[in-house]
Regions:
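Short, charged/polar "capping" segments at the starts of alpha-helices
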Residues: 10-16, 145-146, 176-177
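A short, structured active-site edge motif that brings together acidic residues
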Residues: 7-11, 167-176
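Short active-site oxyanion
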Residues: 1-4, 61-62, 165-166
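Generic structural signal for residues in well-ordered beta-strands
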Residues: 21-22, 38, 167-169
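Cap/insert and terminal regions of metallo-dependent hydrolase folds
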Residues: 73-171
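Short, surface-exposed connector motifs at secondary-structure boundaries
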Residues: 1, 58-60, 131-137
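Active-site HxH/HxHxD metal-binding segment of metal-dependent hydrolases
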Residues: 1-29
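Core dinuclear metal-dependent hydrolase active-site scaffold
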Residues: 25-84
C-alpha cells in the first residue's frame, strides 16, 4: 500500500494499482510535501516513455538519468549545474565491439534509444557539470562490456580538468567507491 509515482504507460506495463499511483507526464513538476519537487524530463530509450528525474530539495538539485542512448537540449538545460548527478555509463565502445553480443543487440545498445557509452557520458557531463557539481555517480555499468576503471577513467578524461567533486560507481551488486 505504498503510493507510486509513474507515467501512465509504465503504470500500465507494471500493472500498478491505479488507486496507489500518482501519474505524471513529461516535464511535469511533481511536488512532494513543502520542500521537495521532482521534474520529469523525457529521455530516448527504445519504445518506452522513459524519463530522467531532476529533484530539488531546499535548493539542492540532484539528477537521476538512466536508460538513454542520447540526450536532448531539454535534458541538458534541466541537469546543468545540478549538485549531484547519477547517470549511466553503460559500456566501453571497444569492449562492446569485441564482446559476446550479436551484432543486432550491439547496434540496439549503441543506438539513439539504447544506452550511453562511457565516452558519451563523459561528453554529456562536460556539458552539464559546473563548479556547483559535487558528486557524480556512474550507474548501469554493463558487466560484460565495461569495467569501473574504464568508466571512471573515460569520464575523468572529459571532466577531470575542471571537476573537483567525487565520482562514485554503483555496481549491480552494490556500490563501489
Amino acid at each position: 500500500n505504498i503510493p507510486v509515482l509513474a507515467n501512465e504507460r509504465t503504470a500500465l506495463e507494471l500493472n500498478l494499482d491505479p488507486m496507489l499511483t500518482k501519474y505524471f507526464g513529461s516535464l511535469d513538476l511533481v511536488r512532494v510535501g513543502d520542500d521537495l519537487s521532482i521534474l520529469t524530463v523525457p529521455v530516448p530509450h527504445g519504445d518506452s516513455d522513459n524519463v530522467a528525474f531532476v529533484a530539488n530539495y531546499r535548493g539542492e538539485r540532484a539528477a537521476v538519468i538512466t536508460d538513454l542512448g542520447s540526450w536532448t537540449d531539454e535534458l541538458v538545460k534541466h541537469v546543468h549545474g545540478c549538485q549531484h548527478i547519477s547517470i549511466e555509463a553503460n559500456y566501453d565502445e571497444k569492449l562492446l565491439d569485441h564482446g559476446p553480443y550479436p551484432y543486432s543487440l550491439k547496434e540496439r545498445i549503441r543506438g539513439r534509444g539504447g544506452h550511453l557509452s562511457n565516452k558519451q557520458t563523459g561528453e554529456f557531463l562536460a556539458e552539464v557539470c559546473t563548479e556547483n557539481t559535487r558528486t557524480v555517480v556512474l550507474t548501469h555499468l554493463s558487466e560484460k562490456n565495461n569495467s569501473p576503471h574504464l568508466a571512471e577513467s573515460t569520464i575523468l578524461y572529459h571532466i577531470g580538468d575542471f571537476f573537483s567533486g567525487d565520482i562514485d560507481i554503483s555496481l549491480q551488486d552494490g556500490p563501489e567507491k
